[in-house]
Design a protein with these regions (language model features):
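Aromatic-rich, lipid-facing transmembrane alpha helices and their immediate juxtamembrane interface loops
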Residues: 2-315
C-alpha cells in the first residue's frame, strides 16, 4: 500500500534533496582532480559551425514534443498561459543578453558560428546567442508541459479550474525566497574574495539568483500548490544533462563561448575545462523561474478573473 502523496511543501524539498544527492558526490569527485587534462587542438577550425549545429539540442526536443508527442495524444495545452510565459521570459532573456553578454562571456571561436552578428552592449555577439535563449525557454517549457500533461499527468492537480477559483490572490510575498537569495549572493561575494580569483564581482551569479528568485519571492506560496513537482524534477534533470553535455564537452573546450573570470564567483571545475559553477546553476534557475511563471499564468487563466483581481485580490 502506498501512503498519501507528499504535500507541495515536502515535494519541493524532495526535489532539492534529489539534486543534492547527485551534486554533492559529483562535486566531491570533481574536486579530487588537481591536475586536469588540457585539450590540444591541432587545427584552427576544429568544429565548423559547431555552435550553430548544437542548437539542435534544443530545436529537436521542441519539434518532437510540439509537433509529435502533444498532437499524437490529443493533448490541449493552455495556449494563452504557454505563450504569455514565452512572451514574458524570452524578451527578458534577450535583454540580459543585450546588456550583459559582453560583460560575462567571450566568444573566441568565431568559426563555430554563422558569423552573423547580433546587437549587444559593447559590441555584436553571435546571432546564435539570441536563438539559444529563445529555443532554451521554449524547450524548458515544452518539456515541463508534456511531462505535466501526459507522462506524469497523474501527479498534477486533478481539478485545476476549481482549485484556481479558490485562490484569493496570486501575488503573495515569500520571505524565505528573499532570504535564500540574499544569503546566496552574500556567500558568492565572500567566496570570491577568498578564492584564487578575488578580483571583480560575481555579477553573473548575482543576475542568475535575482532572475530565478524574483518569481519565487512574488508567487511561490501560490505556485507551490499547482506545480507538478515530479514533472519539474525530471525537467531539471533533462535540461542539466543537455547543458552539461553541451558546455563541458563541447562549448567551453572548443571555444564556442567562454566566461569572463572577473564576473564569476571563482569556483571553476578543472575537470570540465574550467567551467564555472554558474554554468551548472543557470538552467536550474531558468527551469525554476519558467515553471513558476507558467503555473501562475495558468492559474490566472483557469480562474477566469480579470488580471487585477486575480493578482491583487478582490476589492
Amino acid at each position: 500500500m502506498h501512503g498519501s502523496p507528499p504535500s507541495p511543501r515536502l515535494s519541493a524539498w524532495l526535489v532539492l534533496a534529489m539534486l543534492a544527492m547527485i551534486a554533492v558526490p559529483a562535486g566531491i569527485t570533481l574536486h579530487t582532480v588537481h591536475d586536469p587534462a588540457v585539450l590540444e587542438i591541432p587545427g584552427t577550425n576544429p568544429t565548423p559551425y559547431g555552435y550553430s549545429w548544437s542548437l539542435l539540442l534544443f530545436v529537436v526536443p521542441i519539434v518532437v514534443i510540439g509537433w509529435w508527442f502533444l498532437p499524437s495524444e490529443g493533448l490541449r495545452i493552455p495556449q494563452r498561459a504557454f505563450w504569455r510565459t514565452i512572451w514574458i521570459l524570452v524578451p527578458l532573456g534577450f535583454g540580459l543578453d543585450f546588456f550583459f553578454a559582453n560583460r560575462f562571456f567571450v566568444y573566441p571561436n568565431a568559426k563555430a558560428t554563422l558569423g552573423i552578428g547580433a546587437p549587444a552592449l559593447g559590441g555584436n555577439v553571435p546571432v546564435e546567442e539570441y536563438i539559444f535563449y529563445f529555443t532554451g525557454f521554449l524547450a524548458v517549457l515544452l518539456i515541463y508541459v508534456w511531462l505535466d500533461e501526459y507522462w506524469l499527468a497523474v501527479y498534477n492537480v486533478s481539478d485545476y479550474p476549481s482549485e484556481a477559483k479558490h485562490i484569493s490572490r496570486l501575488l503573495k510575498f515569500h520571505l524565505s525566497s528573499l532570504i535564500v537569495g540574499v544569503v546566496l549572493i552574500a556567500a558568492a561575494i565572500l567566496y570570491k574574495k577568498h578564492s584564487q580569483f578575488p578580483e571583480g564581482f560575481p555579477g553573473y551569479f548575482t543576475v542568475l539568483v535575482i532572475g530565478g528568485l524574483i518569481p519565487s519571492v512574488s508567487f511561490f506560496p501560490t505556485a507551490r500548490r499547482f506545480i507538478n513537482w515530479r514533472a519539474f524534477s525530471l525537467t531539471i534533470f533533462m535540461i542539466l544533462l543537455i547543458s552539461m553535455f553541451w558546455e563541458a564537452t563541447l562549448a567551453v573546450p572548443y571555444g564556442w563561448w567562454g566566461y569572463q573570470q572577473k564576473q564569476m564567483m571563482g569556483l571553476f571545475i578543472g575537470a570540465w575545462a574550467g567551467l564555472p559553477i554558474e554554468a551548472v546553476t543557470v538552467w536550474i534557475a531558468v527551469t525554476y523561474g519558467t515553471t513558476i511563471v507558467f503555473e501562475i499564468l495558468k492559474v490566472w487563466q483557469a480562474s477566469g478573473k480579470p488580471a487585477r483581481h486575480a493578482f491583487l485580490g478582490e476589492p
